[in-house]
Amino acid sequence: MLILGFGRMGKEILKECVAQNFNICGVIDPAEDLVGKDAGLVAGVKELGIKINKPKELGRVINDRKPDVAVDFSNPSACLENSEIVAKSGINMVIGTTGFKAKELETLKERILENEIGAVISPNMSIGVNVFWELVEEAVKLLKDRDYDIEIVEAHHRFKKDAPSGTALRTAEIIAKVMGKNLKELAAYGREGFHERKKGEIGIHAIRAGDIVGEHRVLLSTIGERIEITHIAHSRAAFVKGVIAAIKFIKGKKGIYSMRDVIRAGLA
């Protein structure tokens, strides 16, 4: 197994892989203060004899170590570069990177299909969030013609770079699809100025503060009452559990899958 991106999630994934005796083939990260160091020591577990390599070493690491799955929690541009090498090498992927533009995500999916590899792609690997999405979808189906306003509020730690979160955007896409619209037609990112709420719009709001791991709330409100569907991640362990399940799921498969597929396969 190959880890692409050694930030907070990358380190947590490595810890769990060590605990489950996964064979870790390599770690790739561009940070100069990490390159050359032992990945296990950096993650706070034990010395593994696996040095962190620069992205330009990815091809060599693949040729030397021959991983069967690559897990990418980097950033959109890095993920696109990584996927080109990984896909051409015939290695399956688990991709939790967020912040893709529509065209970038389309390019990524085309690359996976063209090279006939398998990939689980999800902006959130948490089992709870994927159930949250199903609950939101069902609620919107029941209420979409009953004069309910829909707002999404997400909160994360001060270090998160993309806003709104990939999870919030995916939530909005699910809602828009149920309403038979394109998200671009309905999305209202934050609010300012002096005007009433537009009928049918989906409000999307982002909070960045402290060390919040991840919170997502959907409000469905009408005159006289309100429903709230909420998911709160207490720690990154919620995401890591899903990543491990996705790694097990994607081995030997071809095509593009979501965490819903992983959950329905009984692996999460």
Where are the regions that the model predicts?
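Glycine/charged-rich beta-loop-alpha catalytic/anionic-binding loops adjacent to active sites
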Residues: 67, 113-122, 222-229
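Short, ordered loop/turn segments at secondary-structure junctions
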Residues: 30, 98-100, 124-125, 155-157
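N-terminal Rossmann-like NAD(P) cofactor-binding module of classical short-chain dehydrogenase/reductase
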Residues: 70-71
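Rossmann-like NAD(P)H-binding beta-loop-alpha module
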Residues: 130-147, 163
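Rossmann-fold NAD(P)-binding glycine/threonine-rich loop
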Residues: 77-89, 96-121, 130-138
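Structural detector of well-ordered beta-strand residues that form the stable sheet scaffold
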Residues: 25, 53, 94, 118-120
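C-terminal substrate-binding/catalytic lobe of Rossmann-fold NAD(P)-dependent oxidoreductases
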Residues: 4, 8-65, 144-268
